[in-house]
Each structure stands twice: as C-alpha cells, then as structure tokens.
Amino acid sequence: MPARSEPYRPDASIVAELAAGAVLLHDPSGDCLLLHQRDEDRWCFAKGHVDPGESLAVAAVREIREETGFEDVRLGPELTEVSYRFYRPKTSENVYKTTVFFLAFTRERSTHAEMIFDRAQWFDLASARVRVKYPTDRRVIDAALRHRSSLGPTEDRA
C-alpha cells in the first residue's frame, strides 16, 4: 500500500498506475462489504494494482481474495472507471491512478481481512454510500445500485 498521500504537486514528475477492484455483494442479502483502512480512517472497497500480464478481471478477483480471505468470489459486470491524481512523498512523484471497478458476489460472510484493515463490515448499499469518504467511491456505489437493479431478484442470478 502506498504511504499516506498528499495533494498533487504540479512541479513533480508523474507515473501512471492501474488498479482493479469491486463492490462485493453478499448473495443473497445484497449487502456490500466495506473494509476499514486503519491508517487513513476510511472505509473502502477491495482493490489493488494490476500485476504485469494480468487482466482487470483476474486482478479484481485476486484482490478480493487477498484482502478479504474469501474464496467464493463471482465476478459480475464492469461498473465504472475512476481516475485521480495525488502526490506520493515516499517516491517524490505524482501518481495518476485509474481503478476499474466490477460488481462481484460471494456467499461467504465471515472475513479474514488483511492487516492494513482493522475491520470489515457488511452494509446495505445506501448505508455504504454514506460511509465512504470520497465522492468517487459514492459514484462507484451509485453504479452498483444501477447495475444491481437491472439484475432483478438474487435468485435469477443463480
């Protein structure tokens, strides 16, 4: 995980990063899993860097498994793409990061979150939208709400 970020600096060099993640829904309840990142005191989705040669879909599933401990992960449709920039003091460079988010499903409930998270909790999507810190994360949840309503009842996805 990158060190705590600072505002973008116009005088620093820039690198591009690609990440993949997901809004993970519990099947059949439809609750959304959020992970609480202790060092930044914020709720977030499972997501992370795409490894060389890895597809976005494979990266999203891998990140969910690594960050939650879940094995039963079924990837749904791509939801949206979010891009933002920030300054990383550790490397003295700006980062332009793009994260592609998917909708994903699991029947598992009990997580074994990575050490960078102090807790994981299930929320209905409306409550999750209130808990996330950034407007971009709210847009991701909005996309999940739109896609979920187009899928119909949970039983239809089996």
Regions found by a protein language model. Give the residues of each.
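Active-site segment of metal-dependent pyrophosphate-handling enzymes
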Residues: 69-109
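Conserved Nudix-box catalytic region and its N-terminal flanking loop in Nudix hydrolases
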Residues: 30-71
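Acidic, metal-coordinating catalytic segment for phosphate/diphosphate chemistry
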Residues: 1-22
